[in-house]
Amino acid sequence: MAASVRILGIDPGSRVTGFGVIDVRGRDHFYVASGCIKTPADAPLADRIAVIVRHIGEVVAVYKPQQAAVEQVFVNVNPASTLMLGQARGAALAALVSHKLPVSEYTALQVKQAVVGKGKAAKEQVQHMVVQMLGLSGTPQADAADGLAVALTHALRNHGLASRLNPSGMQVKRGRFQ
């Protein structure tokens, strides 16, 4: 039987950071946990970052993932929002690295393509596919579903057929090894 790998996926946000934990055994994906880390909207930025770092540390301590994946920041129309999102993402990365976890990063487009099959998918489509892929009985909150989608993306890109066919680490682009 294939060894199990536990992956923590993070969807960073300055107000709500979603997380999802899955186990991967061979080609199968199993739900472990998911949730949202909510920061007080009226708190100073340093306090909000501390909440993110502390809670991600708690998730790592409880679920003991072996790998982590984080969604990359997209550039928003509002520079202040983009900066705050980047700081929340930095807090998440710092928390993961401080626990010596290997971290991979994926764009929102890569996550949507991996989970739904198209990069322009709506949040509801991502939630639906997360439920289907993990056999969940209910629909997780949007941010938690995004965290699970990031973990699934990492699993599909690194523990799927392409990685077994290509152990040398070559990249696959447009269906071809490069």
UniProtKB/Swiss-Prot annotation:
NCBIfam families given in the database record: ruvC (TIGR00228)
Reactions listed under catalytic activity: Endonucleolytic cleavage at a junction such as a reciprocal single-stranded crossover between two homologous DNA duplexes (Holliday junction)
Disulfide partners: none
Keyword DNA repair found: yes
EC number: 3.1.21.10
Gene for this chain: ruvC
Biological source species: Neisseria meningitidis serogroup C (strain 053442)
Protein name, as recorded: Crossover junction endodeoxyribonuclease RuvC
SUPFAM superfamilies named in the record: Ribonuclease H-like
